[in-house]
Amino acid sequence: MKNKLARLILTSSIVVAPNVSAVELYDDGTNNVTIGGFIDARVIHTQGQTEIVNGASRISFDFSRKLKNQWTALALLEWGVNPVGSSDILYNNRFESIQDEFLYNRLGYVGIAHEKYGQVTVGKQWGAWYDVVYSTNYSLVWDGNAAGVYTYNKDDGAINGTGRGDKLLQYRNNYGDFSFVAQVQFKNNDFYTCDIEAISESACQTLWENGSNIAQQVEFNSTYGAAVTYSVNTDLKLTAGFNRGELNVNYTSGRLQSVNDFIYGAGVTWGNFDSKGIYFSANINKNENHDTDNLGRLIKDAVGLESLLSYRFENDIRTFVAYNIFDAGTDYVIQPNFNADPNDNFKRQFSVFGIHYLFDADTIVYIEARKDFSDFTSADKEQEYQMGLSEDDGIAIGFHYTL
C-alpha cells in the first residue's frame, strides 16, 4: 500500500513537470522538503531575428508531512524564472514569452493524500486534461499548441483549467492498472480579447473600456473535467478525458453571446522518453469554443492532433520528430468581429525536429528546428501576415540544466 501512495504522489509530480527532477533539502522523518526545476537558455533564430531567450526556466519547492492514520499533507510552490531578460520574439508559448519579470507564478497548491482514499489538492495546478496529452510535450523549444492545453492564443491554460489551471479542486487515485483524476474549477472572472497579435490584457481592457469594436469582454464561469489512464503494460499507456465550461462574450455594441467551452479526446504512448530506445506518443481532440486564433478571436470548433516519435541511442544522443495540427477550417470565428471574413482559414500545422545530447539525465545540450506548414489564408493580407508571424520557421540551440 505504501507503494501505491508513492505512485499516486509521483504521478501527480510527473504531470506537474515531466522533465523536472528534485533534490532533497530536508527530512526529519516527518517533514520533507525538496527543490526542483531547471534553467534553460537558448539562441533562437525566427521571424527574421536572432535573440537569446529564456527556455521556460523554473524553480519549485515540494513539501510533504506524514500524518496519522497513513495520511500525508503536501504542498507545492513553483515560480517561473527569467534569467536572460525580456524578449521581442513571441515564438511559442505566449505566457512564457511575454514575461519580463525575474520571477512569476506558475503553480501553487496544497492538499492531502492517503494510500487508499487518494489525493485531494486545491490551488493552481496542472489540469486533468493534461494527463491525456502531456506525453507529446517533450520538445524543449516548440510546444505542439494543438492539444488544447495552452489556450487563448498560447497562454498557460489557466482560464479554462486545461493547462496550469487557476483555482482548481482536484482528486486523484489509482486502482490497479488505472489511474484517474477529476476536478472542478470554482471561479468567475473576466478577461479581454482583442483582434491584435501580442497585445497585453491591460491594453486590451483599455480598448474595451473605450468602446473599441476590436475588443471583447469574456466572462468565464466554473469548469469541470476528468481523465483516465490505463497502463496496459510497462510500455503501453492509453489516456482519455474531457473538460467543459461556460462563458459569456460581451461586445461593445451591447450584444451578449453565451457558449459552452468543451474539449474531449484520447491519447496513446509507447515507451519512456528518457529511456534508451524508441518512444512514441500521439493524441487527438475535438473542441468547441475552447481556444482563440492568433488574433484572439474565439474559434467555433476545431480538431487538434499532436504526435512525437523519439529514439535515444546508446551514445546518449536522442533524436525526435514531432508533427502537430490544429484545424478550424473556414468560417470558424463565432464572434461578429469587424474583420471576421467567413472565408478566412485557420490551420496551425508544423513539424519539429530535434537532437539532444545528454551529458547525463539532468544536463542537456540541444538543437531544434521547426518547419511551418500552416494555412491562414485571408483576403486581408496584413491579417494573414499577423496570423502567421508567431508560427514562423525557426532554429534554436540551447542548454538545459536540471537541478
PLM feature segments, named:
Residues G55-I59, R106-V110, G165-L169, S222-A226, ...:
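Hydrophobic, lipid-facing positions within transmembrane beta-strands of outer-membrane proteins
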Residues V33-A41, N69, A73-L77, V120, ...:
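Transmembrane beta-strands of outer-membrane beta-barrel proteins
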